Amino acid sequence: MSNRLISGSTVALVTPFKEDGSVDYEALRRLVRFHREAGTDIILPCGTTGESPTLTNEEEAEIIRTVRDEAGDSMMVAAGAGTNDTRHAVELSRNAEKAGAQAILSVAPYYNKPSQEGYYQHFRHVAESVSVPIIIYNVPGRTASNVSAETILRLAHDFDNVLAVKEASANFEQIMTLIDERPERFSVMTGEDGLMLPFMALGGDGVISVAANQVPKVVKGLIDAMKAGNLEEARAINRKYRKLFRLNFIDSNPVPVKYALSLMGMVEEAYRLPLVPMSDADKATMKAELEQLGLI
């Protein structure tokens, strides 16, 4: 049995806003309690799903403090703290640690399209700036370039606090290389709900999930079933919720999941530009699936 620190079901938490665009801290606390009661293993605010590009440094710090306060010792609090400017990424990481984050999710620099050595040096500076664990976030669909398995493994071997990767490349050759060649302490997490089952079958450690915002017990149940070797149970869960996993990306994340949560009475349907509400047709599709699953 592995003792890896980063594993299980992690929710990539939405950031609830009020109609005036301010952060709804009361709703944020409700969300944390929802996940505490559901048994979520790790809660992760201020990531992509949390609309981090539109949060100020001060808002991010206050969100992390609020989540940590409400979570207590019931689950680990990781936090998104990355950007494409290394100096700013270091600043955000230090701020997150100071605010109470117990791990940092650091996205690969986007837009700049650095070389593999550039990626290495970026994450080296981040890792050396904090004492908490670092989760490298590799998401080529948003960053327009891939952090190679070789670079990720080099970082994992060179820095004791580089403890995980959120791998959202859907490149199974890369995923298998990471799983097969990693240090024992290093976790490989998927960032794609729709790939949880095959990912775990290959030896992955868990998921950093969008769908866990809506169905945390379901996501944890699937991951736990795969860890226990209960393939048929996991397949049944995946079959039932596969459409929801897909509909969460019918529009740009987190627009669909936030709309779903608004129907579930958890948050207001409020975003910060440039994100806008879904089309009426997509809303109807999502609502119908939530009704089908008995979530509303």
From Swiss-Prot:
Just give the chief location class.
cytoplasm
EC number, UniProt record = 4.3.3.7
GO MF annotation terms: 4-hydroxy-tetrahydrodipicolinate synthase activity
Pfam families, alphabetized:
DHDPS
Residues the record marks as site: Part of a proton relay during catalysis: 48, 111
The superkingdom of the source organism is Bacteria
- Binding-site positions, pyruvate: 49, 208
Enzyme type, top EC level: lyase
Which cellular component terms (GO) are annotated to the entry? Answer: cytosol
Localization per Swiss-Prot or TrEMBL: Cytoplasm
- Signal peptide residues are none
> What pathway does the annotation place this protein in?
Amino-acid biosynthesis; L-lysine biosynthesis via DAP pathway; (S)-tetrahydrodipicolinate from L-aspartate: step 3/4
The reactions it catalyses are: L-aspartate 4-semialdehyde + pyruvate = (2S,4S)-4-hydroxy-2,3,4,5-tetrahydrodipicolinate + H2O + H(+)
Q: Which SMART domains match?
A: DHDPS (SM01130)
Catalytic residue positions: 137, 166
Q: What are the entry keywords?
A: Amino-acid biosynthesis, Cytoplasm, Diaminopimelate biosynthesis, Lyase, Lysine biosynthesis, Schiff base
Q: Which NCBIfam families match?
A: dapA (TIGR00674)
Q: How does it assemble?
A: Homotetramer; dimer of dimers.
* PANTHER family reported in the protein's UniProt record: 4-HYDROXY-2-OXOGLUTARATE ALDOLASE, MITOCHONDRIAL, DIHYDRODIPICOLINATE SYNTHASE
Query: Which family is it part of?
Result: Belongs to the DapA family.
| General function of this protein | Catalyzes the condensation of (S)-aspartate-beta-semialdehyde [(S)-ASA] and pyruvate to 4-hydroxy-tetrahydrodipicolinate (HTPA).
What is this protein identified as?
A: 4-hydroxy-tetrahydrodipicolinate synthase
Q: Which organism is it from?
A: Chlorobaculum parvum (strain DSM 263 / NCIMB 8327) (Chlorobium vibrioforme subsp. thiosulfatophilum)
